[in-house]
Amino acid sequence: MAFMSMERSTWAFTFGILGNLISLMVFLSPLPTFYRVYRKKSTEGFQSTPYVVTLFSCMLWMYYAFVKSGAELLVTINGVGCVIETVYLAMYLAYAPKSARMLTAKMLLGLNIGLFGVIALVTLLLSRGELRVHVLGWICVAVSLSVFAAPLSIIRLVIRTKSVEFMPFSLSFFLVLSAVIWFLYGLLKKDVFVALPNVLGFVFGVAQMALYMAYRSKKPLVASSSSAAVAAGLETKLPEHVKEVQAVAKGAVAAAPEGRISCGAEVHPIDDVMPSEVVEVKVDDEETNRTDEMAGDGDHAMVRTEQIIKPDMAIVVEV
């Protein structure tokens, strides 16, 4: 019996070390995403929710490991996870739009400070010994299930856009591997709170990998540069004066019989444009810059989005 117990302990320690290494890979798998965020100085529609929830989960598991004896391997990996997730969130807050920063800050205050503080206070004051371990264990199980379910929004996004841009394969692969290793660790340690949530983690990880294989060769429904905006349900809004210019252009083109209007100006197709004969109007969020380039005998008009007819002048509206 003593030999079997020692062998079980050895295997548990081995799987614990493997779990630490693989979980570290899981924590580091979003690095390409955040390198891209750093390089482009934009979060490009990526959400912070999975990272906030993961940080909260690491904090709770560290607390659980401190309360439960013989769980040092849980302390090490979750401590490292807290540091890594904090770095990710700091980068997100640095480059996200104001609305996303505010939402992330509210989640951090409410979840990682508020709720964690309440849980710590209640378990310290109202429970002791094994009861405290069990209360914390079930809380950790519930939060871990939330962490594994957090990518559901990404799965929905992949199905809608038919693009795997927002779901790295490496993350899904390491989630499956991590779930298997930690399940075996919990089984050998007879810790149901560690083993149970990793069953669902394995299922979600396999689902993500299957989705990646299904959509990796499909053409996205939206262009890569605009997929984030489409995914977020955003719509490009033009200034009112640009809309008025577009309306005038449409009316002028529609009213011109056989390519001419009464004032003598001609309506030319976009293909007939001469680049050297342009008056360009670039529309900015705050100001309008005009660049005039006049050359040649005729006065032609080139319009990128719409054509505007005006005597003796050609106008380009670039939106």
Curated annotation (Swiss-Prot):
It is a multi-pass membrane protein. GO terms for molecular function: sugar transmembrane transporter activity. Coiled coil: none annotated. Its main location: membrane. Residues 13-99, 135-219 form the MtN3/slv domain. It comes from the Eukaryota. Residues 1-10, 72, 128-134, 189-191 are extracellular. It is found in: Cell membrane. Residues 32-50, 94-106, 156-167, 213-319 are cytoplasmic. Keywords: Cell membrane, Membrane, Repeat, Sugar transport, Transmembrane, Transmembrane helix, Transport. The chain crosses the membrane at residues 11-31, 51-71, 73-93, 107-127, 135-155, 168-188, 192-212. InterPro entries: SWEET (IPR047664), SWEET_rpt (IPR004316). GO terms for cellular component: plasma membrane. Mediates both low-affinity uptake and efflux of sugar across the plasma membrane. Forms homooligomers and/or heterooligomers. Belongs to the SWEET sugar transporter family. This is Bidirectional sugar transporter SWEET15. It comes from Oryza sativa subsp. indica (Rice).
